Amino acid sequence: VKHTLPFFLILLVALADGCDRRSRAVSATGGCDESIKLPEGFCATVFAESAGPVRHLAVRKNGDVIAGVLDQRRTRGGLVVLRDTNHDGHADLEARVGEEGVHGVALGSDSSLYVSTATSVLHYRFGADLAPNPRYDTLITGLPQRRPQSHSLAIDPRNNLIVNIGAASEGCQPTPTPNTPGRDPCPELDSTGGLWSFRTDQTMQGLRNGVRIATGLHNAVALTVNPRDTSVYAVSHGRDMLHEFWPALYSDLDGATAAAEEMIRVASMRADYGWPYCYYSYFANQRVVAPEYGGDKHQTTRCGRQIQPLTVFPAHWAPMAMLFYTGTAFPPAYRTGVFVAFHGSALRAPLPQEGYVVAYVAFKDGLPAGETQIFANGFAGGMMSPEGAEHRPTGLAQDAAGALYVSDDKGGRIWKITWRGAGKD
């Protein structure tokens, strides 16, 4: 089922000024979106339509949904705040703030909002209005721009801000060319390839003011804090370009499948997860030395002391967000684990592209238990490719009632997933 805005509402939103905080009407109607395939008893309704290229989400206690929107071609970025005033499951009121693309969003207290741009983290405050006050504090400045859409955010129990800074290269080579060894030691690890912790009560901090809590992560875009154990978790993008950079060693099939996406828990300060010296081999089920550092697909020297992932996912699925479910609205089978949104692959040729799903990983005794379940599918539509997909999952959030929200940076849609009971549609 596809839903569209009436023309006059499209025109109203298009003409609105980006700095205008006035709330305005929006529309998304219809019942369950049958294009989104879910386990029996679940329903995905279109909460918002045409929100723009949305990355991450947050939900306030009052149910307002906050979305970070990227700059993309002629679409301005910034923050979008959406409200369902009549409680029908669809946003009917919208306010926008800012004109700079936003990737990460994280709520501190219910009135305190942190957002990341290409180079900064900004602190907004909510008052009585739908939108936050447009005057903000610059909490962090000068973040590396080499992978600007990677600055995901999370708040830890001590009210520190956790920031991902993705690595710019695949194997820390001085030039991205075939058969080029990596630099050893890798200077990129000084400022990228890990997670940093910053204080939330200081402004104009630079990278030097942060504390690196994890290193050796290629690009940990999916980032969260588990409320149950208060630990920082992430799902990191595995490396790319194994076949393109090392064609004599890796076939095109190797390049499509070898380097897994890794779910990790930050086990200790400055925990090391291997990049660029090692990567996790999906089929060998262990870390192996990267070819830039003399690896042969099997060698494991210098990888033994690096922390192993909790679980792994297929190569190139592109994990974008993760959320530990804490509600009681979903059945018990979905109350112990974590949802992961996958943007979908672009580099699995000669195999078909994969991903474009929301997966669920059950936990038991603090560890993943059982097989990964594809919880929500059908986002891509008829073609699984970055260009051909109708929608690509990016963000996850949960409201106070236990509904799950999923955002999309391709079609600009936000879904609200609820449990209606087995045998109901």
Language-model features: locations:
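Asp-box/WD-like beta-propeller blade repeats and closely related beta-sheet repeat scaffolds
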Residues: 93-97, 102, 119-156, 164, ...
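Residue-level detector of Asp-centered blade-edge/turn motifs that repeat once per structural unit
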Residues: 59-63, 107-110, 155-159, 224-229, ...
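Conserved beta-strand position repeated once per blade in WD40 beta-propeller domains
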Residues: 56, 104, 152, 219-222, ...
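Beta-propeller domain segments
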Residues: 21-38, 167-208, 216-219, 224-387, ...
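Beta-rich catalytic cores
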Residues: 50-53, 75, 93, 100-101, ...
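Surface loop/turn motifs at the tips and blade-to-blade linkers of beta-strand repeat domains
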Residues: 46-51, 95-100, 139-145, 211-216, ...
